[in-house]
Amino acid sequence: MTDGSDERLRRHFERGDESLSETLRDGKSRRRFLQALGVAGAAGLAGCSSASDGGGGTPTDTDTEGGGGDGSSSTDSSDGDGDGGSSGGSTFRMNAVQRFGTIDPAKGTDYTQTMALLNMYDGLVFPNADGELVPHLASDWSVSEDNLTYTFQIREDATFHSGNPVRAEDVKFTVERFFDINQGYASLLSGVLDKENVVAVDEHTVEFTLNRIHSPFLATLVLLFIVDKKAVLDNASDGEFGDRGDYGQEYLNNNDAGSGPYMLDSFERQSSISFAKYEDYWMGWPENSFDNVEIRIITEDPTVRTLMSNDELDMTSQYQSTETYETLRDTDGVRVEQIPTVTVFYMKINNQKPPTDDPAVREALSYGFDYETARNEIAPGSMQAQGPLAPSFGVHNGDIEQPTYDPERARQVLADAGYSEGDLQIVNTYVQSNNMEERMALLFQQNMDQIGIDVELQPQTWGTMTELATSVEETPHTNHVFYGPVYPSPDTVFYNQYHSEAAETWMSMSHVQDDEIDSMIEEARATVDPDARAEIYADLQARLADMYAEMFVFVQAKQHGFSEDVGGYTYRPSQSYDYWFHDYVRE
């Protein structure tokens, strides 16, 4: 259910991420931080849950099976809340349309990878349904007066799946591994934190000292998944990292070393992944929670419809066709929920590759596309975009001119720039077997033909698209990408997509590479005062819009089909955190 969700989105994004210069002073406890954060809102929410809200805490396609870790006994739950493993004795089954390319917590970035990681591993903090950061493996934290040193208290009742206790040394090791491997989201903290400045003060206290003020630091920690140091080193192979070998990379390709609610049970990269409940999870378990979770890669809509109607799936992916959702609405034992999000569907335009390196060409593309048909016919229920940031963010710039369908203007822009009909040929890439994206590509091709631009459609697997993104030359001219906050802060939208340091990923397929954009992002990150930071964000959005850096097609209202007896789903405004299966139950 989504009653009042639009207002909640707006309320909780009211002022963007917070470092909170006033509240983070003089002892600055986590509780004071959260009180202020709750007013200003680190990120937004569209709540959708048929059962209780979650506790604690974009898209198709080498090879090996994986085994999971063994659970050993430990305390039942956190603060006496849990029942230590009350079991529904059942399996939760879901489909995804994109393979799990990696399950190494130092490497994962996309939605399926994060879905797997947040269920096998824990972070220090967790984004709740309102986008606020709440304690997770860290039971509490404080921030120094100069906003540079963050001190975390690690829970004393948490254990890894190996049975080893979670300690401050594991957190320190995780950061070292994260930076040394230097993949995944390591760039988020590049220049902000040096691994040498993470110190295990004692068994349950870890201290991070930043190189500079970094307002979204706490929010980025939802992507730092803590690994079992002993398990990783015990299973390390020879490698480039001295006495740490390969840092357990080969092992963690097919195994887990986490403390999360589920252990890896089996893994077939191309087709499926399954998890088994860690009975001794420190939070305990809701009544009628699932013993096992199975996620199958199924891209064919007729197959999904059949499996749901036969009670062989409990939940669909968010990427099914409109026809599938309409059919499921009329299927006995199935409900379909439409969930407002803060995810934008972008047509990412390669700003560095001719002919789309020409701003005039990008402007023509932007005004030559039929956004209303895209929203109303291809993605019904979606909301109008206005610039790179979803309007539900409180720091959204409502003065941006959002292009509308105006083929006459598009043709005139091209003529003024010296282009004649037939001069321009571009490539458009989208995720193959994704019905919505295929229809969007066909609409784009048709629209561009009307303004004299020839579009070659090249559907690809998601894995291939992510590989193409690593090179400006190989990245196609236009690319379909869903992108929403991967951590609860507006910074995630700007840095990951537009900063030059974050280049050559699927998130940054526009290859903006603009010094002024870089400077504005860095200034916002270093600004503690939320009002001053909001002004920077407004200017940043305006510049990206003026550059026609990419096409902002719509804000997603995603849909899922559910079995009627499944509850506990809660949307959280950080990538894949609504797939935290700990809270899912059989009602």
Q: Where do the model's predicted regions map?
A:
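N-terminal secretory signal peptides
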Residues: 1-28
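Short, solvent-exposed loop/beta-turn-alpha elements that line the ligand-binding surface or hinge
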Residues: 11, 18, 113-145, 224-259, ...
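Aromatic- and charge-enriched surface segment that lines or borders ligand/interaction sites
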Residues: 139-184, 207, 355
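Surface-exposed binding/hinge segments that line
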Residues: 190-240
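Bilobed periplasmic-binding protein-like "clamshell/Venus-flytrap" ligand-binding domains
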Residues: 217-221, 258, 416-433, 477-482, ...
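Ligand/substrate-recognition segments at binding pockets and active sites
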Residues: 269, 288, 300, 415-485, ...
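Ligand-site clamp/hinge motif
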Residues: 278-327, 454
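Append "and occasionally in soluble cytosolic enzymes with long acidic Gly/Pro-rich linkers
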Residues: 356-446, 450, 513-519, 539, ...
